[in-house]
Amino acid sequence: MKRTPYCEILQEYGGKFVDFAGFEMPVQFEGILHEHKAVRENVGLFDVSHMGEIMLRGKGALDTIQRLFTNDYTTLKSGRVRYSLMLNDEGGVVDDVLVYCLSPELYFVCVNASNVEKDFKWISANLLPDTVAEDVSENTAQLAIQGPNAINVIRKIFKEEDIPEKNYSFTLVDGLLNSAVMLSRTGYTAEDGFEIYCACNDAVRLFDIVHEAGKEFDMALCGLGARDTLRLEGAMPLYGHEMDDETLASEIGLNMFIKLDKPDFIGKAALLEKAPTKQRLGIELIDRGIAREHSDVYAGDKLVGYVTSGTMSPTLGKAIAMIRVDKDIDTSDLSVDVRGRRLKAKVVPLPFYKRQK
């Protein structure tokens, strides 16, 4: 198993580790409920160095990005970030990514840990002229500081002018470590928060700085367990659950990130040709129980789909789930098969949780 630069430190702090996407990663510290609550009400710190990073540079970089990704990047200015899907020729989802514009000829793409090798191979195979791709994952570490008090922790570390004001924006900051760090106002928790990218040889020093700054605010160390419950409440899709290579991109409720009016991109023809037959919905269980991943979903007595992600929501105190089901079904009599029992469920709007701004 691979290890992030923070693995030894987090073991010393009592992290319980699991194998995730080939990495030895902490699933929890004091407990998932404690960590989840900390992020919703205060602030939490995550090691997310398992994520992959790919640089695209050159005069053809923007054209390549326009070809590879479903969103439109012609309007993306330096210092801004934009979410997108990357599709195969059949319209299936290769990955979902964040694209950072460092300059019109330099882009930084954050990809899912389980897909780094696949993504780099796909990107490399579809480069347009005057574009170079480089996988910088092995040399990049990342910490996420998330929650209402994240901004106060960040203010103890960075000058005000170096802190990105808007969501989905970032700054490059010199002087904190040996090399520049990238401070991004992004996250995967449905809260305000920041993600800090740095060189691996600066990672331990960065952790010490952030951890010390967080003491005043009782910042919690958080693992992948809380990250999952937080993103699920925010209805944020997870690759391998809500989407994969076989999932038609138009069936997952992310059409706002698919710009069919822009010039050709990989998978566009397939999306125009194929009508969606599935949909992603949010449900809340009426009967007592928890709808876990892969549980069958029924409309009346008809099997119509399955649960892609489900949990007992720590914030809402209700069993919630995202489901992938047939399109145009009658949702008035939904149920989920949980260990042989049909539990009644109702469709609810997504996201399940939205922070008060």
Give the positions of each predicted feature:
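Glycine-rich, Trp-frequent "lid" loop and neighboring beta-strands that shape
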Residues: 98-99
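Short coil/turn segments at secondary-structure boundaries
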Residues: 52, 56, 89, 94, ...
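Acidic, proline/glycine-enriched N-terminal capping motif
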Residues: 1-84, 92
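Conserved, structured C-terminal
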Residues: 1-21, 25-29, 102-357
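Internal amphipathic helical hairpin motif
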Residues: 59-93, 151-179
